[in-house]
Design a protein with these regions (language model features):
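Hydrophobic secondary-structure segments that place a key small or acidic residue at a functional site
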Residues: 92-95, 102-117, 123-193
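Membrane-interface helix starts
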Residues: 9-25
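C-terminal membrane-exit region of the final transmembrane helix in multipass inner-membrane proteins
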Residues: 3, 338, 342-379
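Transmembrane alpha-helical interface segments in multi-pass membrane proteins
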Residues: 264, 277, 286-331, 348, ...
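Hydrophobic alpha-helical transmembrane segments
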Residues: 16-20, 313, 343-351
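A short beta-strand structural signal in non-transmembrane regions
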Residues: 56-59, 147, 174-175, 201-228, ...
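Hydrophobic, regular-secondary-structure patches
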Residues: 20, 24, 28-108, 128, ...
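Peri-transmembrane interface segments
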Residues: 36, 44, 218-270, 278-284, ...
């Protein structure tokens, strides 16, 4: 009977493709928009992920997310170092600086200052120059995407000079740092150099980066730091979750994407449901003939549901495949649009498609179950 259901389904190619299109459209829109949303959320925490080898972030108690910098006094570093369980702690500067380029134009940049002695927080993807070059006077390293933005269609060249806060900065390296939510070029330099590049402030210490001693849980060290210093201390994963929660709760990004996803679900259900219902009405005599031959209602129900499942599988596969192709094209084209498709997106899309085909089939099931077998013998 399942084979009969399949042959009935593809008998009218136009209606079959119409049902598949409705499901595919919904799957494409849900998967694509959900992946773009996940990509945007990943951008908000990219700089936390890029700082490798750091177990604990210490900051002002009122900081809500990674870009919400509230400077600390430099003496807080020594207070953190004195907390039992802290293996080491270093300074870290994060801020926005305005750079004056060689041709006279200005550009906003994300300025990151690394500890002078250890260079903790330095990027891993340096492909021109080296991290050690940061120890040179006025030295900075820039991310590749930022270089392409400032000097588009120009070859990579070290030694470029620009100014920040009326101070000379020399480009000594390029790195493949992760893109950020703000999309500004990223500048890495030594902490002592960063505070000179930045606008003058009484307090300049953005974060204290620390690591627990071997065998001591990071969460326990965070509690000790908070208890003894009054500062906020979180692990790397806690800081990532805290930042994402802020953007989910305090911005309109989730609502905007949710509306688009809901629209795709409704439109997909409407197209698939209407087309599937018309398909059922067109084949009502065939279902009546099956009933006249003794086919039970349960078998008829199974046939309708199997048709819906087959449409769902095809529509889901094509829709998700097109969404993934869209993401691949974005990655290859160096687009500023972010795209990240974790397995959760595939599961959510699958559940949505299942609900769509279920709702679409429910519109037709009653029509099939109440059909009179005598319809076969009517003109």
């Amino acid at each position: 009977m399942l084979w009969v259901a399949w042959k009935m389904l593809i008998g009218n190619r136009a209606k079959y493709l119409g049902i598949v299109f409705g499901v595919m459209f919904a799957a494409l829109l849900i998967a694509q928009q959900s992946s773009i949303f996940c990509g945007l959320m990943s951008l908000t925490v990219s700089q936390i992920r890029d700082v490798e080898g750091v177990g604990i972030w210490v900051m002002d108690k009122n900081v809500q997310f990674v870009d919400d910098v509230k400077p600390l006094a430099d003496t807080e570093l020594f207070r953190v170092k004195g907390v039992p369980g802290v293996a080491w702690a270093v300074r870290f500067y994060k801020g926005i600086a305005r750079a004056r380029l060689e041709e006279g134009s200005y550009e906003q940049m994300i300025l990151l200052g690394l500890d002078d002695a250890t260079l903790v927080g330095a990027p891993d993807g340096v492909f021109m120059g080296s991290i050690a070059d940061l120890r040179k006077p006025d030295a900075v390293i820039m991310d590749e995407a930022g270089y392409r933005r400032i000097w588009p269609n120009q070859p990579y060249r070290l030694g470029r000079v620009f100014e920040m806060n009326d101070r000379r900065a020399v480009l000594v390296g390029l790195t493949k740092a992760s893109r950020t939510f703000q999309s500004f070029p990223i500048i890495y330099t030594r902490y002592s150099q960063a505070v000179l590049f930045a606008p003058p402030e009484r307090k300049v210490l953005s974060f204290v980066l620390a690591d627990p001693e071997p065998g001591v849980p990071p969460e326990e060290v965070c509690r000790r730091i908070e208890s003894e210093t009054g500062l906020q201390a979180v692990t790397r994963q806690q800081f990532i979750r805290k930042t994402i929660r802020y953007y989910l709760a305090k911005t309109g990004i989730p609502v905007n994407f949710a509306i688009t996803v809901l629209l795709g679900f409704v439109v997909g259900t409407a197209i698939a449901g209407q087309t599937f219902y018309l398909f059922t009405v067109e084949n009502i005599r065939q279902f009546g003939a099956l009933k006249a031959m003794g086919t039970s209602n349960w078998t008829i129900l199974l046939m309708v549901l199997s048709q819906a499942v087959q449409v769902g599988i095809v529509g889901y596969g094509v829709g998700v495949g097109l969404a993934a192709t869209f993401g691949y094209a974005i990655a290859r084209g160096h687009s500023r649009l972010s795209f990240f498709m974790p397995w959760q997106v595939l599961v959510i899309t699958g559940v949505a498609v299942f609900l769509i085909v279920l709702l679409a089939s429910l519109l037709s099931i009653r029509k099939v179950l109440i059909v009179d077998p005598a319809i076969v013998f009517r003109g």
